[in-house]
A protein has these predicted regions:
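N-terminal capping/interface segment
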Residues: 4-7, 32, 98
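Short, well-ordered helical secondary-structure segments
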Residues: 6, 21-24, 29, 93, ...
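Local sequence-structure signature of Cys/Sec-based thiol-disulfide redox active-site neighborhoods
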Residues: 22-71
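Proline-enriched interdomain boundary motifs that mark the N-terminal boundary
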Residues: 31-34, 143-148, 293-303
């Protein structure tokens, strides 16, 4: 049984001198969280993967990717196909108002002059608009900074993520902290790979076999995340999140294919602050560092 263990240590501190450890306390601009909706049988989706990766590569400390496999194109065709769906993907996709694949939300925001795929006021954008939307977000100031560090204990099977939130100015909006677990270097089939992303083709049992990246595997605090009740300037909030990682994601899902084993050695976490179920204000990514028995390893830390 998948077990999500959450330990929340909330300490609201108006002065950070003795508490803050790795989050920045200097006012900064927003970072981009691109949630890309994709699927193994979406022929144009590899082009979306290329665009998203290009945005990250051009802004490695400011643009973070979450690839969400959901919808009909993500469904396996038979028992030899991996199922990359999660229990969270459909709801996130439906909330975006997406009308085709690939689609993506840039901070779950709406943009003047950029039309969404669906009805007005929805957030899913066609891939040709991701760069322009990202540039707008990167130019906006953020009222909150976020830091994260992550480690996985190979002997206990527990992923631990420490986050720190610091408010550089006051907001009256509801804030929710989310921690997404993403997996890289996941082999599987992919339509359109030869045409749009041949560099991601690897050896393997599918024709072609594709190296999937940034694949959503879990939301450590559920779909709603952790709500913050104090969001005034100078507030510092540390949290510890834990997940007893299962072998695969079969719990709570059925499939026509199979659920591949999870690989903690190829994982990152993307933490982000959103205004309730709405716009993401900023985010940060941290590599998951695996700690082996009798080995000592420092966490990789990221902050914004």
């Amino acid at each position: 049984m998948m077990k999500n263990l959450l330990t929340v240590a909330l300490a609201f501190v108006t002065t950070f001198a003795f508490a803050q450890t790795f989050v920045s306390t200097t006012p900064e601009n927003k970072n981009v969280v691109l949630e890309e909706f994709t699927g193994i049988y979406c022929g144009f989706c590899p082009d979306g993967h290329v665009i998203g990766q290009g945005l990250h590569d051009a802004n490695p400390n400011d643009v973070f990717l979450i690839n969400i496999h959901t919808g009909g194109y993500a469904n396996p065709n038979g028992p030899s196909d991996p199922d990359f769906n999660t229990i969270f993907g459909a709801a996130i996709g439906n909330a975006s108002g997406l009308a085709g694949y690939p689609a993506g939300t840039v901070n779950r925001a709406t943009f003047s002059g950029i039309s969404p795929q669906g009805s007005p006021g929805t957030t899913a954008l066609s891939r040709g608009d991701w760069a322009a939307a990202s540039a707008i977000i990167l130019g906006q100031s953020s009222y909150v900074n976020l830091g994260a560090q992550a480690s996985y204990d190979m002997s206990t099977g527990i992923l631990t993520v420490n986050t720190e939130t610091y408010y550089t100015s006051t907001t009256t909006n509801i804030n929710n902290l989310h921690v997404a677990v993403v997996e890289n270097n996941v082999p599987g089939p992919q339509s359109g790979a030869q045409n749009y992303n041949p560099g991601a083709i690897i050896s393997g049992p599918w024709n072609p076999t594709y190296n999937h990246q940034h694949m959503l595997r879990h939301l450590m605090d559920g779909a709603m995340g952790i709500e913050y009740s104090v969001t005034t300037a100078g507030t510092f909030v540390p949290n510890t999140h834990t997940w007893n990682m299962p072998a695969n994601l079969s719990t709570g899902q059925s499939t026509n294919g199979y659920f591949p084993d999870l690989d903690p050695t190829n994982m990152d976490v993307v933490a982000f602050i959103a205004e309730g179920p709405g716009e993401i204000i900023t985010g940060v990514q941290a590599e998951v560092v695996c700690i082996f028995p009798n080995a000592y390893d420092a966490n990789v830390t990221a902050s914004s």
